[in-house]
Amino acid sequence: MDKIKNNKLIIEFDHTKYDDDLLGGKTIRINEISLVNKINNLQENDLKQLLNNNGIVFAQYRIPATDLKKRKVLNKLNFYYISTVTELKLEDIQSKTFSLGENVEIKPFEKGMDESIIMDIALNNFGHGVFYEDHNLQDKAVERFKIILEKYLDKDDWKIVLLKNLADDKIVSWAIWHWEDENLGLARAELLGTKFVKIPRLGTYTANAMFTDIKKHGAEKCDLNITITNLPMATIYMRLGLKFKYSTEIYHYSMN
């Protein structure tokens, strides 16, 4: 893990060469942002200045979903890709309402509730998005993504969603939806430089039946780190004791 810092901020990050090739500039994945002086608040301009001074044009940020202050600042930097990655534990879900953001809420487990409806969730903005201040980078990323999609999908099946910035109504990001489609999963995996593992949908599976299928992929030998839109299926993963990350992408967040 690398660090960049000045007299105000410290950013811990991992460098990703794959995205350098995609975007034509230095790209990092931010793991943590710390204030040098804890009395101060995290300021948008301070963060932007530190990244710019180090030649970073694109940053992916992994932030606990409950850290709303940092997310508020990061959302103002609308040319950065903003991601929340939260590790969920079954005992947390059973004991309290767990919020992932303004559109995402997991309600407590109720005794006698069927495991297929343990979680009641509302997702309005879900997918993978990229934000740019520079629309040339925007176009370059979209073209790269189209090339990848051509390998897996017919053109008519492309599910590209153009999102609009709520402030100025300019198109600032693209997204692809419905990761449960296998071909889309393969395309997404190549785009992100990650491994795609096909896991069957929950359906009427029990935990034991799910574990049997997971074993076919050798997944019990490694941590699962996949985006899951079907949260009841995520619950079964947790009951099996598999390490698991639930990922959502937040496109716009406003603090009232």
Spans of model-derived segments:
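Conserved acetyl-CoA binding element of GNAT-fold acetyltransferases
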Residues: 20-37, 86, 184-196
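Acyl-donor-binding surface of acyltransferase catalytic domains
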Residues: 35-113, 248-253
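A conserved beta-strand-loop-helix scaffold within acyl/acetyltransferase catalytic domains
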Residues: 14-20, 129-194
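Conserved acetyl-CoA-binding loop-helix of GNAT-fold acetyltransferases
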Residues: 39-50, 199-216, 235, 239
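Conserved active-site tyrosine of GNAT-family acetyltransferases
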Residues: 72-74, 236-242
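Conserved GNAT acetyl-CoA-binding A-motif
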Residues: 54-64, 215-226
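A short helix-loop-beta-strand connector motif used in the catalytic cores of GNAT acetyltransferases and
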Residues: 1-2, 55-57, 82, 150-162
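A short beta-loop-alpha structural element at the N-terminal edge
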Residues: 105-129
